[in-house]
Amino acid sequence: MLFRSLVNGRLTPALGDHVIPVGDIIGTAVRQYLGTALPLLDTTAHLVIRPRVSHASSPGAVLGQTASQPAGRRFWFAPRSLDDLAERRRMFSNDTSAGVGYAPFGIAERLAAGIESHLTSPDSLAARPYFGTDVKLMVIRDGRRVHVTACVPQIAGLTPDLEAYQARRAEAREIIAGVAAGLAPGCEVDVAVNTRDDDVRRELYLTAIGSSIESGDEGVVGRGNRANGLISMLRPMSMEGVSGKNPVYHVGKLYSLAAQRAAEELHALTGRTFAVALVSQSGRDLEDPWQVLAQASGDGPVDAGLVRNVVAGVMGGLDDIRAGLLAGKIATA
């Protein structure tokens, strides 16, 4: 079984005469990440990495004599020196887009995030290595009744027979019910696991490495979870993908995380549910959103001054978000 990882986008292959080994960097990053996410995948023997990268300038680059031409779009991804890096002079938005965040999570969201996190935690996988990591959940709440449908893969090489599979499927159901009881006390929760299984035909959710990616599923940035790890259909969201983007000035990444942080701070200060949208304008100062929209629960008025102060504080602290991203401390999916 051979897996292919396609890496697309623009990268800087050199700074002047100093060559940057982008191929090695890509290979190391992909193998490290997939090795962690899919521990049964042999990233040396069964993974082919195909970079499709460019250092082409952005639209609007002005061509001309290279030596005398000042820094601009032409040299954005092919800098002659540090002086060609526009972000050293001014941090600006790379695109016209929007980031959206909200707080707090509702019951269904807490369950979806908590159950998935529990089942895929290192401790859980160490205790139950026969479960895969590609866990998917749909959670619907109707008043105090909560319906959970889960897809929990099992590792074929560690599943000797149908009886073992059935017992572990039941075990997964019990684990989910237990986690749900702790996260949503007072709710009546029903749980279904691997509803597509046909035990008679032995069509089961068995995988070699613990993910449906091995049978043709693909993962594309922007298609799927938001920055908070969820796809909440009745919540405000943008279609911006957070993963795979530059943490320095890509608004699809920074504004999504900043909006989430602002919503969380506003909720903590007021106790009200908040949704925040930050809208950029291409070329505008990154710390100065073009538009800010805030929505709060309840009948009373929203303190506009409080919202402005919180958003200004978050935007002034973008360096903290960048540092957290580079340190791997902020989740992006």
Where are the regions that the model predicts?
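Small-residue-enriched alpha-helical segments and adjacent helix-cap loops
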Residues: 10-21, 25-36, 44, 241-243, ...
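Conserved active-site and cofactor/substrate-binding residues in soluble primary-metabolism enzymes
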Residues: 21-29, 106, 110, 167-175, ...
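Hydrophobic alpha-helical bundle architecture
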Residues: 240-285, 295-300
